[in-house]
Amino acid sequence: MTGIELHGKELEMLQYECHVSGAIAPKRPNMLLISENKIDYQPKSAIILCEQKIIRRQLRRARNDLRILSIEAYKSINNIEIIHSNDFETSEWMEEQRKLGKIDGFITSKEIFESLKFNGRRHTLLPDPKEGGGAYFLPIPYSDLIILLTRKSSPKSLTRVMTEKEGETIWWVQNQILGSLTSQELANTSILVRHRKVKSLMEEAERYKDLTLEQACHDSEGEVVDSEVHVELKIEKISKNGKRTIGIHRIIPYSKFEYATISLIRDWEVILREVSQDVPQDSYHDKIATAFIDLEE
């Protein structure tokens, strides 16, 4: 089953005497923009439809002069009363709207794009910008993550063949960070967890001139540690208008990722608490500043 289907249902899983015995790493975690133009080349006020709240906010962050609408909002504005039973029907309808010229593009998954064999151009919303400061798009929670559920009596030799080390890492980290979140909190959260080799991290640090990233690849004595896989973890929340982002980014040696994840969760909770409350007056001359970001919107 998918990771999002298991979210919040672990107690029910235990009642059926099942447990997570492994996971398969996402092969297609990134969403696609179906449009003739990339996001950077969209005309001003272009209409882009997107069902995922956090992706809409990422698009507004990249281009605040576009009309990024949910499907429900678009139907309401245009008095459309069509009801779709699943994501495939919704994507087919959005493709028809695009071909008719009523919208400029829409967001869908790679699975739906390949299943429906759309003819339009596709542009992958990648988590790594082409250059420093460029637009980037972190995946939605549990994106394309497949979980292996088995009963306790199931042979472990069978699951070892199917499961993947990176998939297990992604599930464990995301479940620790997101497992207690409500669906509303989950909707405004994007997260990226992946295994990285030191060589690729060093190349990225050199490309972006990122000294912090480069230091993460050295040990306490300054030597490059090239024998161990690292776990990269990024998590973000974005304001409704896309103008304010809070996030945390960690590069963790695989041997320490469990302890480091618990530490990250504590740091993330502190960050969320601090940025979501009003800033008190330092003196009677000051005005109370509003919170940096509203986590409820």
Where are these regions (language model features)?
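Small-molecule-sensing regulatory modules
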Residues: 56-297
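Short beta-strand-centered segments that line the small-molecule binding cleft or hinge
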Residues: 1-30
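Residues that line or immediately flank small-molecule/substrate-binding pockets and catalytic motifs
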Residues: 6, 37, 110
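Flexible hinge/capping segments at coil-to-helix
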Residues: 31-47, 66
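Residues at the C-termini of beta-strands that transition into short coil/loop
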Residues: 23-24, 37, 72, 152
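Solvent-exposed alpha-helices and their adjacent loops that cap or buttress functional pockets
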Residues: 25-26, 38-42, 99, 138-141
